[in-house]
């Protein structure tokens, strides 16, 4: 059994909370690339825009490496949203006090592969 070739793209240090981006990633995980991009285009979240950029990069990497591929044959195999570093900012409060506000960052990794169809039309 031959192993399928995967293509990936990774973006680091995006200023977005991983807990807010993960639900968007779960919507498009394990879907065909074209359908996933259409879904992301209709979502109003900031995370949808960020994931869309990384998915375009992964598809571009795949097409650059293998010229016979096109976007209709790509499949989103995995999306990982990892936690990045946190920026600590001072938030001034009343009576001379201050609170620490954490600006969270995330790393997004998208893995795409070629979708293989069997003779009966189902995915294999």
Swiss-Prot record:
Give the keywords, sorted: Ribonucleoprotein, Ribosomal protein, RNA-binding, rRNA-binding
User: What InterPro entries does the annotation carry?
Assistant: Ribosomal_uL22 (IPR001063), Ribosomal_uL22_bac/chlpt-type (IPR005727), Ribosomal_uL22_bac/org-type (IPR047867), Ribosomal_uL22_CS (IPR018260), Ribosomal_uL22_sf (IPR036394)
Query: What's any one GO cellular component for it?
Result: cytosolic large ribosomal subunit
Named from the GO MF annotations, one term is: rRNA binding
Segments crossing the lipid bilayer: none
Residue stretches in coiled coil: none
Q: Which BP terms from GO are recorded?
A: translation
Lineage top rank: taxon:
Bacteria
Known partners and oligomeric status: Part of the 50S ribosomal subunit.
State the family it belongs to: Belongs to the universal ribosomal protein uL22 family.
Role noted for this protein:
This protein binds specifically to 23S rRNA; its binding is stimulated by other ribosomal proteins, e.g. L4, L17, and L20. It is important during the early stages of 50S assembly. It makes multiple contacts with different domains of the 23S rRNA in the assembled 50S subunit and ribosome. The globular domain of the protein is located near the polypeptide exit tunnel on the outside of the subunit, while an extended beta-hairpin is found that lines the wall of the exit tunnel in the center of the 70S ribosome.
What this protein is called in its record is: Large ribosomal subunit protein uL22
Q: Which organism is it from?
A: Treponema pallidum (strain Nichols)
